[in-house]
A protein has these predicted regions:
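Transmembrane helix-boundary elements of multi-pass transport/secretion proteins
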Residues: 1-58, 62-75, 160-164, 180-196
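Membrane-spanning alpha-helical segments of multipass transporters and channels
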Residues: 51, 62, 71-196
């Protein structure tokens, strides 16, 4: 789950940095209109990234898990229902963060450096019980923290969807918050590209 989040953030960050570097945000502004629409741009980007990562998740969960005989105790419908808010929160976080980069290399330098802390905060390498409570709470701002916790319980332990409702709620809250940040970030980028 951390790998999915970090590759998505780096990839979306590189696209955002490239768009800034080469002035591609101007192409997203509809010609002849004074008012720029932000939500269709954010929704379109989110749909494309979700389509790409749906294929990636199918490979990881459908083929990779079976090929290496990883435990698959969860129900497919529960796992898909869990992955939807996880994927959306990662995508909107990626779009929001991508608006901060002026060049594509900046995303690699920052987000690759953030990968180890994201792994530690997720609870995958350091158990939650070994972390200070404030650090655990801070880690909840990343989708991977709730994603790892819920996914392990669903996939490996065979938990039902109702057992991971707390993580699902956190992921939906992150989706809404990061969706708002993404819309604001894209709006500011489009405004800057329009020269206003």
């Amino acid at each position: 789950m951390v790998i999915i989040q970090q590759t998505m953030l780096i990839g979306i960050g590189m696209i955002g940095g490239t768009s800034s570097e080469f002035g591609l945000y101007k192409k997203l502004i509809p010609p002849g209109r004074r008012r720029m629409s932000t939500l269709p741009v954010v929704a379109g980007k989110a749909f494309v990234y979700a389509s790409i990562y749906a294929v990636t998740l199918f490979y990881i969960l459908g083929l990779h898990y079976k090929l290496f005989h990883f435990p698959t105790n969860g129900h497919t419908a529960d796992i898909i229902a869990f992955l939807i808010p996880y994927l959306l929160s990662c995508i909107f976080l990626g779009i929001a963060v991508s608006t901060l980069f002026q060049r594509r290399e900046q995303s690699i330098m920052l987000l690759l450096w953030c990968s180890i802390p994201a792994l530690m905060l997720s609870g995958a390498s350091v158990p939650r019980e070994a972390m200070p409570e404030w650090l655990y709470r801070f880690g909840q701002i990343l989708p991977s923290s709730s994603g790892v916790e819920g996914f392990i319980r669903l996939q490996s332990m065979g938990a039902s969807f109702s057992d991971v409702l707390h993580e699902v709620r956190i992921l939906w809250i992150l989706t809404i918050v990061y969706g708002g940040f993404a819309a604001v970030g894209i709006h500011l980028r489009l405004k800057k590209a329009a020269g206003k």
